[in-house]
C-alpha cells in the first residue's frame, strides 16, 4: 500500500519496462485498492501524445499481479477494459516501489456515472438483456478457468460506445480449487446479507452482483443488497425478473456460475407459463396455489383440493406437479406470490413437469362451477 499512498505528480513522466513513457495529467479516483490517474502515452523520442490512457497505482504487489494476469487472460475481449501495460518502478530517495497498471481511458465513464446523472432513468429491458448476455459470456470463460471478479458494481462497469465493459480486476482471484479463493475482500453493499456465513468466494457471488447490476440498469438507480426484496416490483418482463430473482437468490435454485446464468437468461423467455388443461385429476398431485381467487380464499381452496385427493404445498418444490394461478396476482400481499411464480418458471426451464392451470380448470377438477 505504501506505493499507492505516495501520489504521482501532475506532469510526472514514468517509464515502463518496454520503454513506453506515460505523462501523468491528473487524478481520477482513489480507493482502498489503488489510485487512478488520467495520463498520456508519449512518443519514444518526443513529448507528442500517442494515446490517452488510465494509470492505476495498485495498493499492493498482489493486487498488481492479479490485475495484470487478468488483463492477459482476457486480452482481446470487447466486454472488458483493455490492459495496455503493466510494470513496477521505484522513485524517491527511499526507492518506494509503485505497481502500475495502464489501461485504456474509458471516456464514457461507468454505470456509476450514469446513476449520478439525474436525467438517466435506466435502459429498456431488451438492451439490458443484451448487455447482461455479453457480461455473462465473459464470466462464463472466467469461471471455467477458476477466476472470480469479486467486485462487480456500477463503478467497476464501464461504457465504450454505449456498450458495457467489465473493469477493475484488482481483487479478482484465480484459484485451481473452489476452496482456494478465500472471502477476504469485497464491497458489503453488493453482497448477500448473510455473507459472513461463507468462508470462500463462490462463482455464484459474481452472479449475485450481476443480478443487482441488472436492477440498476433497468431503473437508473443504484441497487444494493438492501433492495433485493423489491425485485418483483420492477417494471420488466416476467422472464427477466425471474432471472434476476434467481441470480440474487442466497440459496435454492440460484445460478452457480456464468455458464448457468448465461443459459438461463437465454432460455427463460421460451418457458410457457400460460394456462393448460393440466392433469385429468388432482389425485396424488402436489399442488401450489398463488394469487387472489374469486372462488374462495386459499384456505378454502386447500380443503377442496385435498378433498379431491391432492396434496397442497406452501412452496414450490422438487415434486410440485401443479401450479394453480389466479387471474389476479396480488403483489401487495406477502412475498410468496412472486417466489412461487418465479420458482415454477425456472423449474420448468430446467425440465421439471409442472402443469400451470387457471381458476376455471381448478373448479372443474374439484367439482365446482366456475364463478
Positions of predicted regions on the chain:
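Activation segment signature within eukaryotic-like protein kinase domains
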Residues: 131-132
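Catalytic-loop of the protein kinase fold
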Residues: 143-159
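Conserved short submotifs of the Hanks-type protein kinase catalytic core
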Residues: 94-110
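Conserved activation segment of eukaryotic-like protein kinases, specifically the C-terminal portion
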Residues: 181-195
Amino acid at each position: 500500500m505504501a506505493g499507492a499512498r505516495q501520489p504521482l505528480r501532475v506532469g510526472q513522466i514514468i517509464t515502463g519496462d518496454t520503454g513506453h513513457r506515460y505523462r501523468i495529467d491528473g487524478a481520477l479516483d482513489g480507493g482502498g485498492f489503488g489510485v487512478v490517474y488520467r495520463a498520456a502515452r508519449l512518443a519514444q523520442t518526443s513529448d507528442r501524445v500517442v494515446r490517452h490512457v488510465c494509470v492505476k497505482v495498485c495498493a499492493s504487489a498482489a493486487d498488481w499481479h492479479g490485475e495484470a494476469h487478468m488483463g492477459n487472460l482476457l486480452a482481446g475481449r470487447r466486454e472488458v477494459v483493455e490492459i495496455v501495460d503493466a510494470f513496477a518502478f521505484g522513485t524517491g530517495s527511499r526507492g518506494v516501489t509503485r505497481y502500475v497498471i495502464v489501461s485504456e481511458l474509458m471516456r464514457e465513464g461507468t454505470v456509476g456515472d450514469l446513476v449520478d446523472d439525474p436525467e438517466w432513468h435506466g435502459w429498456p429491458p431488451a438492451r439490458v438483456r443484451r448487455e447482461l448476455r455479453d457480461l455473462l459470456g465473459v464470466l462464463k470463460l472466467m469461471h471455467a478457468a477458476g477466476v472470480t471478479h469479486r467486485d462487480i458494481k456500477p463503478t467497476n462497469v464501464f461504457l465504450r460506445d454505449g456498450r458495457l465493459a467489465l473493469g477493475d480486476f484488482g481483487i479478482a482471484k484465480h484459484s485451481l480449487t473452489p476452496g482456494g479463493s478465500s472471502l477476504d475482500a469485497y464491497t458489503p453493499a453488493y453482497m448477500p446479507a448473510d455473507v459472513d456465513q461463507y468462508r470462500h468466494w463462490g462463482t455464484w457471488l459474481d452472479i449475485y452482483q450481476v443480478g443487482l447490476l441488472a436492477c440498476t440498469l433497468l431503473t437508473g438507480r443504484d441497487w444494493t443488497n438492501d433492495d433485493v426484496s423489491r425485485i418483483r416490483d420492477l417494471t420488466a418482463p416476467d422472464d427477466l425478473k425471474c432471472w434476476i430473482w434467481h441470480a440474487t437468490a442466497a440459496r435454492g435454485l440460484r445460478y452457480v456460475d456464468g455458464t448457468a446464468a448465461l443459459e438461463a437468461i437465454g432460455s427463460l423467455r421460451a418457458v410457457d407459463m400460460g394456462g393448460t388443461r393440466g392433469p385429468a385429476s388432482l389425485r396424488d398431485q402436489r399442488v401450489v396455489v398463488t394469487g387472489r381467487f374469486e372462488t374462495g380464499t386459499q384456505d378454502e381452496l386447500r380443503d377442496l383440493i385435498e378433498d379431491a385427493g391432492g396434496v397442497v404445498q406452501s412452496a414450490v418444490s422438487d415434486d410440485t406437479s401443479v401450479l394453480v394461478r389466479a387471474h389476479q396476482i396480488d403483489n401487495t400481499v406477502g412475498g410468496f406470490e412472486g417466489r412461487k411464480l418465479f420458482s415454477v418458471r425456472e423449474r420448468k426451464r430446467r425440465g421439471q413437469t409442472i402443469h400451470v392451470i387457471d381458476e376455471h380448470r381448478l373448479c372443474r377438477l374439484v367439482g365446482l362451477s366456475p364463478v
